[in-house]
Protein backbone atom coordinates (compact mmCIF):
# COMPACT_ATOMS: atom_id res chain seq x y z
CA UNK A 1 0.00 0.00 0.00
CA UNK A 2 3.04 2.31 0.12
CA UNK A 3 5.40 1.11 -2.62
CA UNK A 4 5.97 3.70 -5.31
CA UNK A 5 8.49 3.64 -8.14
CA UNK A 6 8.29 7.45 -8.29
CA UNK A 7 9.09 7.74 -4.57
CA UNK A 8 12.02 5.34 -4.96
CA UNK A 9 13.34 7.09 -8.06
CA UNK A 10 13.06 10.57 -6.51
CA UNK A 11 14.13 9.62 -2.99
CA UNK A 12 10.76 10.57 -1.47
CA UNK A 13 9.89 9.17 1.95
CA UNK A 14 6.48 7.54 1.52
CA UNK A 15 6.11 6.21 5.06
CA UNK A 16 2.65 6.72 6.56
CA UNK A 17 2.18 7.94 10.12
CA UNK A 18 0.01 6.26 12.75
CA UNK A 19 -3.17 8.03 11.62
CA UNK A 20 -2.63 7.10 7.99
CA UNK A 21 -1.90 3.48 8.96
CA UNK A 22 -5.18 3.33 10.89
CA UNK A 23 -7.02 4.76 7.87
CA UNK A 24 -5.40 2.19 5.56
CA UNK A 25 -6.58 -0.53 7.93
CA UNK A 26 -10.11 0.85 7.75
CA UNK A 27 -9.96 0.79 3.93
CA UNK A 28 -8.79 -2.84 4.06
CA UNK A 29 -11.50 -3.90 6.51
CA UNK A 30 -14.43 -1.95 5.08
CA UNK A 31 -13.70 -2.13 1.33
CA UNK A 32 -10.85 -4.37 0.22
CA UNK A 33 -11.57 -7.53 2.22
CA UNK A 34 -15.29 -7.63 1.29
CA UNK A 35 -14.30 -7.04 -2.35
CA UNK A 36 -11.69 -9.82 -2.25
CA UNK A 37 -14.19 -12.22 -0.69
CA UNK A 38 -16.77 -11.44 -3.40
CA UNK A 39 -14.31 -11.70 -6.29
CA UNK A 40 -12.47 -14.72 -4.86
CA UNK A 41 -9.36 -13.25 -6.50
CA UNK A 42 -6.53 -10.98 -5.39
CA UNK A 43 -7.29 -7.26 -5.44
CA UNK A 44 -4.45 -5.42 -7.15
CA UNK A 45 -3.69 -2.08 -5.51
CA UNK A 46 -2.07 0.18 -8.09
CA UNK A 47 -1.88 3.14 -5.70
CA UNK A 48 -2.50 3.31 -1.97
CA UNK A 49 -0.91 5.70 0.50
CA UNK A 50 0.92 8.67 -1.02
CA UNK A 51 2.78 11.19 1.11
CA UNK A 52 2.11 14.86 0.36
CA UNK A 53 5.55 15.05 -1.27
CA UNK A 54 4.72 12.08 -3.50
CA UNK A 55 1.33 13.55 -4.39
CA UNK A 56 3.10 16.73 -5.46
CA UNK A 57 5.72 14.80 -7.45
CA UNK A 58 3.07 12.98 -9.51
CA UNK A 59 0.90 16.05 -10.06
CA UNK A 60 -1.80 15.11 -7.57
CA UNK A 61 -3.23 17.35 -4.87
CA UNK A 62 -1.68 17.35 -1.39
CA UNK A 63 -5.26 17.16 -0.09
CA UNK A 64 -5.87 13.85 -1.90
CA UNK A 65 -7.45 11.15 0.24
CA UNK A 66 -4.44 9.03 -0.76
CA UNK A 67 -2.29 11.34 1.43
CA UNK A 68 -4.56 10.57 4.39
CA UNK A 69 -4.47 6.80 3.80
CA UNK A 70 -8.19 6.87 2.97
CA UNK A 71 -8.06 5.93 -0.74
CA UNK A 72 -6.81 3.23 -3.06
CA UNK A 73 -6.76 2.70 -6.80
CA UNK A 74 -7.43 -0.90 -7.75
CA UNK A 75 -8.17 -3.55 -10.34
CA UNK A 76 -8.91 -7.28 -10.29
CA UNK A 77 -7.55 -9.41 -13.13
CA UNK A 78 -10.34 -11.06 -15.12
CA UNK A 79 -13.18 -8.85 -13.83
CA UNK A 80 -14.25 -5.78 -15.82
CA UNK A 81 -13.74 -2.59 -13.83
CA UNK A 82 -17.34 -1.57 -14.37
CA UNK A 83 -18.56 -4.78 -12.73
CA UNK A 84 -16.28 -4.13 -9.75
CA UNK A 85 -17.51 -0.54 -9.49
CA UNK A 86 -21.17 -1.60 -9.47
CA UNK A 87 -20.45 -4.21 -6.80
CA UNK A 88 -18.68 -1.65 -4.62
CA UNK A 89 -21.49 0.88 -5.10
CA UNK A 90 -24.09 -1.64 -3.94
CA UNK A 91 -22.22 -3.52 -1.22
CA UNK A 92 -19.81 -1.37 0.80
CA UNK A 93 -19.81 1.96 2.59
CA UNK A 94 -17.51 4.40 0.78
CA UNK A 95 -16.80 8.09 0.54
CA UNK A 96 -15.92 8.33 -3.13
CA UNK A 97 -16.02 5.82 -5.99
CA UNK A 98 -14.56 6.84 -9.35
CA UNK A 99 -14.20 4.87 -12.57
CA UNK A 100 -10.94 6.50 -13.73
CA UNK A 101 -10.14 6.79 -17.45
CA UNK A 102 -13.20 4.76 -18.38
CA UNK A 103 -13.41 3.72 -22.04
CA UNK A 104 -16.59 1.82 -23.00
CA UNK A 105 -14.63 0.00 -25.72
CA UNK A 106 -12.06 -1.34 -23.23
CA UNK A 107 -13.63 -2.93 -20.12
CA UNK A 108 -10.18 -3.66 -18.67
CA UNK A 109 -8.93 -0.11 -19.22
CA UNK A 110 -8.54 2.48 -16.52
CA UNK A 111 -8.92 1.69 -12.85
CA UNK A 112 -11.18 2.21 -9.85
CA UNK A 113 -10.52 4.82 -7.17
CA UNK A 114 -12.38 4.18 -3.92
CA UNK A 115 -12.09 5.89 -0.55
CA UNK A 116 -13.43 5.45 2.95
CA UNK A 117 -13.80 7.93 5.81
CA UNK A 118 -14.19 6.22 9.18
CA UNK A 119 -15.87 9.14 10.91
CA UNK A 120 -19.23 8.24 9.39
CA UNK A 121 -19.37 11.09 6.93
CA UNK A 122 -19.00 9.06 3.74
CA UNK A 123 -20.54 11.01 0.86
CA UNK A 124 -21.32 8.00 -1.36
CA UNK A 125 -20.13 10.12 -4.30
CA UNK A 126 -20.00 8.12 -7.55
CA UNK A 127 -18.23 9.55 -10.60
CA UNK A 128 -16.87 8.45 -13.96
CA UNK A 129 -13.82 10.13 -15.51
CA UNK A 130 -13.21 9.56 -19.21
CA UNK A 131 -9.85 11.33 -19.31
CA UNK A 132 -11.43 14.71 -20.03
CA UNK A 133 -14.34 15.28 -17.68
CA UNK A 134 -16.10 13.87 -14.65
CA UNK A 135 -19.74 12.83 -14.82
CA UNK A 136 -21.96 11.73 -11.96
CA UNK A 137 -22.78 8.05 -11.65
CA UNK A 138 -21.50 4.95 -13.40
CA UNK A 139 -21.97 4.16 -17.08
CA UNK A 140 -24.42 1.46 -18.05
CA UNK A 141 -22.98 -2.05 -18.04
CA UNK A 142 -22.83 -3.82 -21.39
CA UNK A 143 -23.67 -7.51 -21.60
CA UNK A 144 -22.75 -10.19 -24.13
CA UNK A 145 -23.76 -13.84 -23.81
CA UNK A 146 -24.76 -13.32 -20.18
CA UNK A 147 -21.42 -11.75 -19.21
CA UNK A 148 -20.49 -8.16 -18.45
CA UNK A 149 -18.15 -6.83 -21.12
Where do the language-model regions lie?
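Extracytoplasmic cell-surface/polysaccharide-interacting catalytic and binding patches
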Residues: 1-38, 131-149
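Glycine-rich, flexible loop/turn motifs
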Residues: 8, 54, 63
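Amphipathic alpha-helical interface surfaces
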Residues: 27-31, 41, 54, 70, ...
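Extended, low-complexity, intrinsically disordered C-terminal regulatory tails
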Residues: 33-60
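Structural recognition of the beta-strand scaffold that forms the well-ordered cores
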Residues: 44-46, 71-75, 113-115
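Short, flexible, solvent-exposed loop/turn segments with mixed acidic/basic and small polar residues
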Residues: 57-67, 102-105
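Acidic, His- and aromatic-enriched active-site or binding-groove loops in soluble protein domains
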Residues: 62-82
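Catalytic cores and adjacent binding grooves of peptidoglycan-active enzymes
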Residues: 76-149
